[in-house]
């Protein structure tokens, strides 16, 4: 339990004691004490609506109940400086400043672990994200999904969940046959043949580049094979090269996966047939018009879904169901799928299938990633200037950098459309949020170096009593909010909570710095206390940025 959680628990105990002492309810009647951080800091550090909850039991007006509670509340015992009653009976608590100072040794002791919690209680979570078809470069939707998925994984990991990251390789469908045919055509074209592209072929530059690479490596030796053998080779070679490229781009993007799961392996292992058999054994399928159907309407879907077509082939849903069954078979307690905006209709049918398999649908969560629009020079960027095709993740990283790309994709709710301002992302100004946060970190590091050069020591045991100004306490409150922000972001899977938190913390630091002289050579005790505060700030900013996959530079 972190510092602020301990404080909240202490407050709950004291509120409960005050309720009983004021004889407003019996032991069994006292409701759970809800404590929330008010949006307006003028309303204190924590607020409770316990007076409203007690109104029916105590048969009194909430405000009168609040007044009785405050009269019976031991502020000193709870570490509260003052209490205010607001509106119809909300009780606002303002923390004692001495208690806030205790945050500094906690952060300095926990270091990289500051912000961690056991909210997840070791729950095993599998997050599947990106999972782009290995038939071309990663585009902006994949880029946003990668940033969101990885950030959620980082946050949940810090909050005590056991997280696994997985990429599902779609290597068993028609798209792979089209990849093979496209690469075959480009290979023969590079060798000088007048070979037409297949009707559903891929026309991207990446296929041409792979064909040229193959010619450089092997010349025309594959032209000698019969077409069936050559297409089989092209399938494997093209898939290998596309995956290599995807892995390189994601590695540069600071995204790594614990497992790359092949769709083909589902067929080779018999898992697809097994998933279908499980549904049949549970009487969740039926035969009609020569096809096998899933009774998905029984679980909220708008219509039943075909699993096996009349010709005996599977629909795309069948291997997907078996894949999710496999995820549960591997011991995961919860599944999170990060999917593109075009997958809205997929959710109810997969949730229905999971229920049909016998699992609680609450164990299946979906994070939808909405579309991204790029803007540069005030105009929408529709195509890459270099290739004339859609802008890729690689190009965006080259244009604005990994840090800005990751932060911008995480700073808004994933299920809302994002306008990505490329000019803002590279600007060295306070309007650029990632620059603003990184500059705060670099500024603190500069102060710490200055203190080191002057030989002013500080540690977790430094006397912190000289810390007494309003700006110092505002900064401490911002630092203290980090564990709660991580816990909330993890339980609700809202990565933007951490992006916004990092910005708010940077804002508190800049506001403090603008009116405060950290190092005073005439007052070593004050300087040491403030340097300890700066170190706690630096560690917290760094930890927040790490969750976002963003670097924390020491110099800028």
From Swiss-Prot:
A molecular function (GO) term: arginine-tRNA ligase activity
Assigned EC number: 6.1.1.19
Pfam families in alphabetical order: Arg_tRNA_synt_N, DALR_1, tRNA-synt_1d
Main location as per UniProt: cytoplasm
Keyword annotations from UniProtKB, A to Z: Aminoacyl-tRNA synthetase, ATP-binding, Cytoplasm, Ligase, Nucleotide-binding, Protein biosynthesis
Any one Gene Ontology cellular component term annotated for this protein: cytoplasm
Catalytic activity: tRNA(Arg) + L-arginine + ATP = L-arginyl-tRNA(Arg) + AMP + diphosphate
Compartment(s) where it occurs, according to its Swiss-Prot or TrEMBL record: Cytoplasm
PANTHER family: ARGININE--TRNA LIGASE, CYTOPLASMIC (PTHR11956:SF5), ARGINYL-TRNA SYNTHETASE (PTHR11956)
Subunit structure as annotated in this protein's UniProt entry: Monomer.
Full protein name: Arginine--tRNA ligase
